[in-house]
């Protein structure tokens, strides 16, 4: 189990617990529930300026415990 910190452009920070084997799409579903957002499909996550694709695992993107991700809405 890892804990990932997600920041939006308004300064809101959310800690999300997940598995490193989870796909980005699964992570976005958990995140949307925590944020109270209607749809995970409206969420875009970035790490170091690169957009994370839904079908790739967090582990493949080298997202580890304590990693910061940027949150955007489309």
From Swiss-Prot:
Keywords: Ubl conjugation pathway. One of its GO terms (biological process) is protein modification process. It holds the Pfam family ubiquitin. InterPro entries: Hub1/Ubl5, Ubiquitin-like_dom, Ubiquitin-like_domsf. The keyword Transferase does not apply. SUPFAM superfamilies: Ubiquitin-like. Residues 1-74 form the Ubiquitin-like domain. PANTHER family: UBIQUITIN-LIKE PROTEIN 5 (PTHR13042). This is Ubiquitin-like modifier HUB1.
């Amino acid at each position: 189990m890892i804990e990932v910190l997600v920041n939006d452009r308004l300064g809101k920070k959310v800690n999300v617990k997940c598995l490193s084997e989870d796909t980005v799409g699964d992570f976005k579903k958990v995140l949307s529930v925590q944020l109270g957002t209607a749809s995970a499909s409206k969420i875009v996550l970035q790490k170091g300026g690169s957009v994370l694709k839904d079908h790739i695992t967090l582990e493949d993107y080298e997202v580890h415990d304590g990693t910061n991700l940027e949150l955007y809405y489309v």
